[in-house]
C-alpha cells in the first residue's frame, strides 16, 4: 500500500514539473515575460537617422562615399556590400552595382538570375 502511494506521489510530482516546464516555454514564446520584453525595448537604437548622419559627416573621403557602408571608393560601383558573408555584389554594367542575398544559391546563380531578369527571360 505504501509503495503505491509513493509511486502515485512520484508520478504526480513528475507531471507537475513537466507541466511547469511547458507553461514556462509557452510564456516566453508568446511574450509572457513582460519585464524581460520591456528591457529589450529600452536597448533598441533610435529610429531616426541622426547617428548615421553623424557618421556620414565625420567620414573623410575625397572620392565617392558609399551610402550603405561609408567606404571611400573611386566609383559608385566599387562600393562593397554591407554584409559580404550573406550577400553577393553584382555589377550591372552601367557603372552601377547591387548587393543581393546569396539565399543558398550556387556560386554565381544569383548573378545569373539578375541577368535573365534584365533580359526579360525570368
Curated annotation (Swiss-Prot):
**PANTHER family for this protein:** LONG CHRONOLOGICAL LIFESPAN PROTEIN 2
Function according to Swiss-Prot or TrEMBL: Probable component of the endoplasmic reticulum-associated degradation (ERAD) pathway.
Q: Tell me what this protein is called.
A: Long chronological lifespan protein 2
GO BP term, example: ERAD pathway
Record key words, sorted: Signal
List the top taxonomic levels of the source: Eukaryota, Fungi, Dikarya, Ascomycota, Pezizomycotina
Instruction: Kindly give the InterPro entries that the UniProt entry links to this protein.
Output: LCL2
- Signal peptide range in chain numbering: 1-21
Family as reported in the entry's similarity comment: Belongs to the LCL2 family.
